[in-house]
């Protein structure tokens, strides 16, 4: 199984990332999920592990880019 890595990039170019179930540089933030169709889906939460869910609430907006080998967000 390939490791799941999420790159979370805020519009001011600050880069945060989730690797496996470890959320590094965690802040409370809002996310948009960028998909290949250029549509955006607003996320209130996302799953960082089998039993870990990070709640997202704030005024900053981030985009999420999928690395090669990551097919979708686990909701």
UniProtKB/Swiss-Prot annotation:
Localization, UniProt: Plastid, Chloroplast
Keyword Plastid part of the UniProt annotation: yes
Name assigned to this protein: Uncharacterized 8.8 kDa protein in rps12-tRNA-Val intergenic region
GO cellular component, one term: chloroplast
Native organism taxonomy: Eukaryota, Viridiplantae, Streptophyta, Embryophyta, Tracheophyta
This protein's UniProt keywords: Chloroplast, Plastid
Chief site of localization: plastid
